[in-house]
């Protein structure tokens, strides 16, 4: 029987050459459908008697007298895809790229190490052979290639960042991990997670919406900045994250996420957590939003969407305040005197001169700040500017909510 293209038929006597290692694998064409069954094959690495210092890779079929396909080791491309999954790409004209599955991960690791070292030995042209290992021989550490003053061997081929086959395999592994975790298969989940970790696959693991309380619900939000406060109602879902909530407020009202600080249940919220994580489950649950001073834009740049700043709550939410819109200041208005104190480098809050840490975020007072003499400064009472009209229920200061001395989540 004539051998297929890309391989040379050899005698069926494995003892005709020095066999370094032989392993049993399940072989199937790469990218073949699930209906294509894997075929049992025997791979063996042996020294080439006709070319000293060179090696050849042989694939034996099942049964006596089966044709052996063999290739010079330097003509094939061998890639490790996982603990038990390797790929063999014969030279052009052969059977195409083959997927090799090992039953034993230790045997697969030993085989890959020997193929790698034999490839380096062949590229360096060394006459020394790696030690022969039979199927029952205990694995030993392969000898390190000797450093010789020859040009370095070319680096192995690096996989492209994206390819259709690689993407399909990663998605299949992610699906396998999901099904294993959902079904309580700890072993299967560990195997899939190990392969994904070896390939440094970036994943996003989150609970399905079915595990959260039903929505949508109305979230009652008290909004406050350095000048005023207001009450608004937002339609949200309990599975919504704080980051998504920040984007919703940015889209509806123009306050960028960088100036938003959310407090729910006496906890300073983290963008990655969900509303349900902080106890938001039903209509009317309260939340608190404090707006920091808007960050300054870099010179020459303009914001893509309008961004609101301090003092604009009265113009944004006149209905929630029950008041007419705040009148615009006239040119004859005198500027307010500067508030004594030191600005927080983290949240820009103006703190009292005698306060050692920020009242909002507990950041330590800058060492370079030089307070004015206490004799020339009178402690001013802390006030909040309010529009003329009825007082609003709810908190007017962050003090009752942002107890940052130890109650942060």
UniProtKB/Swiss-Prot annotation:
Keyword Oxidoreductase on entry: no
Stored CDD domains: PH_SHARPIN, Ubl_HOIL1
UniProt biased composition (Pro residues): 140-153
Top-level taxon of origin: Eukaryota
Residues covered by region (Self-association): 1-178
Chief location category: cytoplasm
Pfam families per record: LTM (PF25393), Sharpin_PH (PF16764)
Localization per record: Cytoplasm, Cytosol; Synapse
Residue ranges occupied by any Ubiquitin-like domain in the UniProt entry: 217-280
Zinc finger extent (RanBP2-type): 338-367
UniProt xrefs under Gene3D superfamilies: Phosphatidylinositol 3-kinase Catalytic Subunit, Chain A, domain 1, Pleckstrin-homology domain (PH domain)/Phosphotyrosine-binding domain (PTB), Zn-finger domain of Sec23/24
Pathway: Protein modification; protein ubiquitination
This protein's GO CC annotations: cytosol; LUBAC complex; synapse
Region (Disordered): 121-164, 315-337, 384-409
Role noted for this protein: Component of the LUBAC complex which conjugates linear polyubiquitin chains in a head-to-tail manner to substrates and plays a key role in NF-kappa-B activation and regulation of inflammation. LUBAC conjugates linear polyubiquitin to IKBKG and RIPK1 and is involved in activation of the canonical NF-kappa-B and the JNK signaling pathways. Linear ubiquitination mediated by the LUBAC complex interferes with TNF-induced cell death and thereby prevents inflammation.
Descriptive protein name: Sharpin
Native organism: Bos taurus
